[in-house]
Amino acid sequence: MQIASRKVIAGLMVLALCITTLSSAGSDVEAKAKASLKTKKIFVKVGKKKSILIKNKTKKYSYSFTSSNKQVAKVTSKGKVTGIKAGKATITVKEVLKKGKKKKGKKKKRTLGKVKVTVTGMKKKNVVTPTPETVNKAAATAEVKTTPTATPSATAPVEPTASATPAASEPATPTPIVTRSPAPRPTLAPGMPELDKNNLTVADYPGIASDVPDLDIIRVGQNYYMVSTTMNLVPGVPVMKSTDLVHWEIVNYACNRFPNRDLFNLENGQQTYKNGSWAASLKYNEKTKLFYVIYNVNNDGFYCYTTPDIENGTWKAYYIQTSFHDPALIFDGDGMYVIYNGNNIQKISLKESSAEGGIGEVVKEGGSRALFNKTLGGFKWSLWEGAHAYKIGDYYYLMIIGSYGSWFRREVCYRSKKLYDSKASDWEAQLIFEGSTYEYGTGIAQGGIVDTIYGDWYGFLFQDHDGLGRVPSILAVNWDYVDTKNNKYYPDWPMMGYYDDKGNFVNCLGTSQKVKNPLTIQLNKSDKENYIVGDDDFSYPDFKEGDSLKKVWQWNHNPDDANWSVTENPGYYRIKNGKVAGNIWFARNSLTQRTVGPNFTSETCVLTENMKPGDYAGLAAISAHYGMVGVKCDENGNRYVFQGCNSDTNSGAKAKKEDRIEENDVSEEKIEGNAPVYLKIEYAFNTGKTRADRANFFYSLDGENWKSIGETFSLGFDTATTFMGTRSWLVNYATKEAGGYVDFDYYKVK
C-alpha cells in the first residue's frame, strides 16, 4: 500500500509538472503571436462593403479603424469598409489595450498598419438603361446642336453614368457595362437617334480588311469622320464617314494635288513612293466652325487644310517648309498646337494668303520643345511615333505607338493636367494595350479614342497584315479598369481591350494576349455598306474640266491632265502616253483602287487598237513589287496578251526608271483591230488560319471564257518600295515612243 501510494503521488506530481510546463509554453506562444493585419489592400465598388481582417486577435485588446477620406470610403468600429465614391483612401488600424488589463511593459496603444482602399464603379441606382422613354426625355430638354458643327465630344458638358446591361432579346455577343470616363457623359440632343438594343453594330477583326493606316477619327454630332495615309496617291488624305464606326464610305479628300514638282509628277526619274502625305490628324474647332487636317509631306513640308463642310466643301491650304513628323493637332483655349515626333510641341497659327485662292502660311509661334523623355515610365522604346492628342476631363492625353526593338507594336498613353506650360515631371506614362486578335497575331497599335453620343468610348488602332496592308480595328475602352487578378487599378486611363463571354472587360497587356471576341458597339447598325472600293463604267455624261472621278479612285502621283479623258470616247477611261516612261513605276495617269481581304477580284476590259510598238497596257497588282496582266505591242506592231512582273523583286528594292518588266508568259492569239481584251486578277490574302498573299492572272477574248496566264505572283508589304497594301492599277505606258493610247471600258470588283 505504501509503495502504491508513493507511485500515485509521484504520478500526480509529474502530471502537474507537465500541465504547468504546457501552460507556461502556451503563455509564451501567446505573448509572441501578436495581432497583425491580414488585409493589406481592398478593392470595393461604390455601395458595396468589405471587411478588414486581423490575425491573432485577443480579448485583451480592442481595435480602432480610421479612414483618411470618408468621402471615398467609410469604416465601422468593426472594420467594415463601405465604398462611397470612386477614388482612393487609407484605413489606419490601431490596437488598444482594454482598461484594467495593463501589465508592466505593455503598451496601451499601437498601430497595426494601414489598409489601402480603392473604390471603383458607381451605385447601382445610377446605372441608366437607355430606353426610348429616357432618350426622348433627354432629347426634350437638351439644347445641343445636331448639325455637323456640334460641340466635339471631349468638351461636351455632361454627367457621368453607365450604360446598360444587355437586354434579354439581344444577340449572343454580350453588350458590356461601360464604365465612367473622365469627361462627363453627354445629354442627347433633339433629333438624335434612339439606341436600338436589337440592332447594334458589331465590329469584327479586322475592322476594315483593307489598307487604311495611320487613321484618325473624330465625332461631330452623330457622324464619325476618319482620315488616313495614302502616301504618293492623289487626291490625297481621304475623308471617310460612318455613323456606327464599322461601315465607312469615302466622302471627300483634303488634298486635291501635290505641288507641281518633278518628284510628284514622275518627271526626270524622280518619284515620291513611300513618301507623300503621312499620318494626317483631324480635328473640329467649335469656335471657328472649321474642320482642320494637318499632315507632313516628306521631301516637301507641313500642310494644314481647313473647310467648313468636311463632306462636300473645298479646302483652304496653308504651308510651311518644315517637317513635323506624324503630327497631332490639338486646340487649347485660343491656342493651336502640333505634337510631333511623339513628344515635341510647337504652337502655330495660320496666316491667309494675299493672293486669291493662294496657299496661306503656317506660322511658328515661339520655339518647340520636348514635353517629356520617351523613357518616362521606364520604357525603352525603339520605334516611338504617331501621336494622337486629346483634352478629356482634367487631363491632356497623348497616345503613341511603340516597340522595344522587335516588330511587335504596342500602344502607350501619357497624361498631364498641363500641356504647353507643363514640366516633364507633370507627365505620367501607362501602357494601355499590348496584344493582337484571334484573327491575326501581329500587334495592334497607333491610333486614338473616340466617344459616342451616348457617352461610350472606343479605341481605334491598326495592325500590320502583310500583303493586305495596315488594317484598322476598333477596341473597347475602359476608363475605370480594375485588374482584380493582379490587384491593379487604372483610374482615368483609357485601357483598351475586349469583353469576354460573360460581358467582363479584359485588357490585353502581353504579346501573347489576344482580343477573343467581336465587339458589340453601342451604336445602331448603319444600313450602308462600306464604300472604299467600287465598280465604274466610266460613264460621266456631265463631266467638265475640274470635276472628279468616283471617290474610290486615286491616281499614282499627280496626273497629267492633258493625257487622260472620260469624254474623248464617252464611257471609257482613256490613257494617252504623253512621254516614254519605261516601266509601271513611272507611268502617268495610272488609276488605282484598294483591294479587300481575304479574297478579292479586279476585272477590266481594254481596247488596244491605238497602241504603239513598245507599249504595255492592262491591269496590275501593285504590292511590295508589281505583277501585271495586259497587252503588249511588239516592235512590229503586233499585239498579244501577256503576264509579267518587275525585274528587280529584291526586298527593299526602290522604284527605278531603269526597271523593265519581265514577261513570264505571252498568249499565242494575236489581237486584231479594236477587239476588246478582258483582264482579271484574283487575290488571296493571309488570314490567321491560312497563308496566301498571292495573285493569279486571267484573260478572256469574249468576256465569258477565261484562261489562266503566267505565274502566281507573291504579294507582300515593303516599307522601302510602296509602303502600302496591295492595290489594283489601270495602267498604260510607252517604252519606245509617245503617242499611243488605250481605252478602258469598265472596272469591276468582287
Give each language-model segment a name.
Residues 26-142:
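Extracytoplasmic soluble-region selector
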Residues 18-28:
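C-terminal segment of classical bacterial N-terminal signal peptides
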